């Protein structure tokens, strides 16, 4: 065990990227069902599509999984509303400041990780 496996309650310290256009429920549930942390890539999904993928994730796995949300997404209010309503437990944020949404997500017992870039190196920081 290490800090990643303990934090997310996963078997292996593997986190799939929340890649736009390809990180849907099938890929994310496959990663989660095999001991990693699968992430839905919300950046390319309209709110209704994201909601559908979240519901399919709930059906496809009982293992931990999360969503990667680019904070520059134009419909963030709707995305956050869906995340709260559908009881998502883990949210990775990127592409913007997490300050506006982190307190609300944490208040609802959601683990929040912000992914940011420094120059060419990508870093992950638990908020």
Predicted regions and their residues:
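Active-site entrance/lid segments in N-terminal catalytic domains of soluble metabolic enzymes
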Residues: 1-126
């Amino acid at each position: 065990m290490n800090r990643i496996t303990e934090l997310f309650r996963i078997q292996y310290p593997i986190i799939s990227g929340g890649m736009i256009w390809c990180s849907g429920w099938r890929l994310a549930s496959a990663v989660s069902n095999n001991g990693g942390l699968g992430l839905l890539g919300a950046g390319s999904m309209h709110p209704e599509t994201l909601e559908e993928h979240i519901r399919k994730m709930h059906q496809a796995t009982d293992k931990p999984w999360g969503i990667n949300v680019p904070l520059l997404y134009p419909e963030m209010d709707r995305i956050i509303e869906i995340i709260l309503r559908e009881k998502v437990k883990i949210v990775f944020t990127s592409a913007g400041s997490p300050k506006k949404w982190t307190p609300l997500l944490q208040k609802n017992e959601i683990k929040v990780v912000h992914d940011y870039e420094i120059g060419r190196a990508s870093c992950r920081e638990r908020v």
